[in-house]
Amino acid sequence: MSSVPAPREYFLDSIRAWLMLLGIPFHISLIYSTHSWHVNSAAPSWWLTLFNDFIHAFRMQVFFVISGYFSYMLFLRYPLKHWWKVRVERVGIPMLTAIPLLTLPQFILLQYVKEKTENWPTLSAYEKYNTLAWELISHLWFLLVLVILTTVSIGIFTWFQKRQETSKPRPAAISLAKLSLIFFLLGVAYAAIRRIIFIVYPAILSDGMFNFIVMQTLFYVPFFILGALAFIHPDLKARFTTPSRGCTLGAAVAFIAYLLNQRYGSGDAWMYETESVITMVMGLWMVNVVFSLGHRLLNFQSARVTYFVNASLFIYLVHHPLTLFFGAYITPHISSNLIGFLCGLIFVMGIALILYEIHLRIPLLKFLFSGKPPVKRESRATIG
């Protein structure tokens, strides 16, 4: 436990908030993309598909690196049990709150929009369970993964801390090239695990809870650990905050490979395994691209930025049902994909900000959507 707080990393706070808020244009562009979603426009847009694919190819990898960085920073600051309790509450309470208040109404809405209400009674018990798992967790999956990673990392972080206490500080003797090789091998290992599961028991890959708890956690744990290592080794963080032409070019090539795999790959062949390798290394390279840009452009304190940093989780939680409502009832009346996309951004962001301001004025909702208990203010005793 450290009594000396680490200096505030404004650029990491800002990047994390921007990555969260990118979920809004990501899901709105999904409506207008060639990808099949809950709701789609009459005619897809190639450039919105490209935009959607680009965000999807790297956003969450970078997010989990930042999560690992801050998680380990707080791990050093608080006792173990308090750290785990606070971290789980901060993500677990908003997730559990959003299920009955957001994703359950969203599920009911989609049942009517997609005219599936009559089919529900005909589903088996497992089909109902699995449908609810996918639909109720929905866009909250990363919160579930964060709870799991926080719990799993107890042993890993404790080991890191003991090594720090018993070993002399020394630079992390690893280059971005070596890291790229490591993450390439991790991508291959993940692809091999998925292929083995596909051969042995393919049905389990369609199970919602297995996907969230096992497959998503396995994929993102290297990025979470990388974030912790970046906090331990300042020189490693410096590699990410220093622009690298190799990482930029590598990310561009990886994205082209990602698009080609999307276009020509087959789900019955090696499409998903290939994608895991590509997005594993692209995620690493985009950490450098995003961190270096963020360090240059966002490393300052601003009341406006702080507002959106604090609001980003709430906005992300409520944007998904708002996006689906827009796609189901407003998109069909807008013929232009560009105008529809821009209207969607204004509609979703505007209502989300209004809801955010309303929830700030209701203490119970403020607690439920943040996981932060209200701060107790001690009254001043009168002297005299």
Curated annotation (Swiss-Prot):
GO terms for cellular component: plasma membrane. This is Glucans biosynthesis protein C. Coiled coil: none annotated. Pathway: Glycan metabolism; osmoregulated periplasmic glucan (OPG) biosynthesis. The keyword Membrane applies. Belongs to the acyltransferase 3 family. OpgC subfamily. It is a multi-pass membrane protein. Necessary for the succinyl substitution of periplasmic glucans. Could catalyze the transfer of succinyl residues from the cytoplasmic side of the membrane to the nascent glucan backbones on the periplasmic side of the membrane. The chain crosses the membrane at residues 17-37, 54-74, 91-111, 140-160, 173-193, 212-232, 240-260, 274-294, 311-331, 338-358. It is an enzyme of class 2 (transferase). Its EC number is 2.1.-.-. The keyword Zinc does not apply. It is found in: Cell membrane. InterPro entries: Acyl_transf_3_dom, Glucan_succinyl_AcylTrfase, Glucans_biosynth_C. Keywords: Acyltransferase, Cell membrane, Membrane, Transferase, Transmembrane, Transmembrane helix. One of its GO terms (biological process) is glucan biosynthetic process. GO terms for molecular function: acyltransferase activity, transferring groups other than amino-acyl groups; transferase activity, transferring one-carbon groups. Signal peptide: none annotated.
